[in-house]
């Protein structure tokens, strides 16, 4: 018996999130169905991040136990990719310590959010980015992003049904102009509340459109009221990029 961790990428467009749902298509269900085909039994899996409906992943980490020690990591990777649907792909499989749970053991999670800035939409990117038809003030957004860094009570930036401890630590928020029409918001933290990254992005865009002043972010953080923050940024622009252990 051994434990392995798979690094997985998926297009979240046609998934009702990562976590198993009784009546909807999810990444976890597709992954565990593939495991059952390979190993002829139900095998539970443990993921680093439970992405929401429409959210993508570049480096999701999923661990599980393998009883057939004769299967190499490459064998497992190839077998999974032969069975998984075309919108899920295993990039790597490696052996890990017994009982490894990436959700509990991740020291850092990194999310990327892409914003497409153009007068006209690019229909081929409609499930990949948030299209905004006007320029953003990136310098103001960078100043505002500093307020999110450090340990804070993120009650104002979570969904109402998330009852977990709202104290979270954000290591870094970067606003990167990849091209004149493509902005990357990179958020690094130990762990996140439900929709927290999308709520952060939505607030930064409010600053970038000059609707809010930079200091508004601090005001909303201190108020601890979700109603004061704007709507979440759309799901399709968000990617679970990687995790560090």
Curated annotation (Swiss-Prot):
What InterPro entries would the database entry show? PsdUridine_synth_cat_dom_sf, PsdUridine_synth_TruA, PsdUridine_synth_TruA_a/b_dom, PsdUridine_synth_TruA_C, TruA/RsuA/RluB/E/F_N
Q: Name one Pfam family in it.
A: PseudoU_synth_1
Q: Name one GO biological process term.
A: tRNA pseudouridine synthesis
Q: What is its EC number?
A: 5.4.99.12
Q: Alphabetically list the UniProt keywords.
A: Isomerase, tRNA processing
Gene Ontology molecular functions: RNA binding; tRNA pseudouridine(38-40) synthase activity
Indicate whether Iron appears among the record's keywords.
no
Record keyword Isomerase present: yes
Report the top EC class in one word. Answer: isomerase
Q: Which reaction does it catalyse?
A: uridine(38/39/40) in tRNA = pseudouridine(38/39/40) in tRNA
- Location of the active site: 52
- The transmembrane residues are none
Binding, substrate:
111
Subunit relationships: Homodimer.
NCBIfam families registered for this protein in UniProt: hisT_truA
- UniProt record similarity statement: Belongs to the tRNA pseudouridine synthase TruA family.
Any idea what job this protein has? Formation of pseudouridine at positions 38, 39 and 40 in the anticodon stem and loop of transfer RNAs.
Name of the molecule in the record: tRNA pseudouridine synthase A
Q: Which organism is it from?
A: Petrotoga mobilis (strain DSM 10674 / SJ95)
């Amino acid at each position: 018996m051994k434990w392995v961790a798979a690094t997985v990428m998926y297009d979240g467009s046609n998934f009702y999130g990562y976590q198993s749902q009784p009546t909807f298509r999810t990444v976890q269900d597709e992954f565990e169905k593939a495991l059952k085909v390979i190993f002829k039994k139900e095998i539970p899996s443990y993921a680093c991040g439970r992405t929401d409906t429409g959210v993508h992943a570049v480096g999701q980490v999923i661990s599980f136990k393998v009883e057939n020690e004769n299967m190499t990591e490459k064998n497992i990777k190839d077998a999974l990719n032969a069975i998984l649907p075309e919108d899920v792909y295993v990039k790597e499989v490696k052996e890990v310590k017994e009982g490894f749970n990436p959700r509990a053991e991740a020291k850092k999670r990194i999310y990327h959010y892409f914003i497409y800035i153009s007068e006209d939409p690019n229909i081929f990117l409609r499930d990949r980015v948030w299209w905004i038809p006007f320029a953003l003030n990136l310098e103001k957004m960078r100043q505002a992003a500093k307020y999110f860094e450090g340990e804070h009570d993120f009650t104002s930036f979570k969904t109402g049904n998330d009852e977990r401890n709202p104290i979270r630590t954000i290591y870094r928020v970067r606003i990167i102009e990849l091209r004149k029409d493509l902005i990357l918001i990179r958020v690094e933290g130990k762990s996140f509340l439900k929709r927290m990254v999308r709520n952060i992005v939505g607030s930064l865009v409010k600053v970038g459109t000059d609707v809010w002043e930079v200091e508004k972010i601090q005001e909303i953080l201190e108020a601890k009221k979700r109603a004061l923050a704007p709507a979440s940024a759309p799901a399709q622009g968000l990617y679970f990029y990687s995790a560090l252990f």
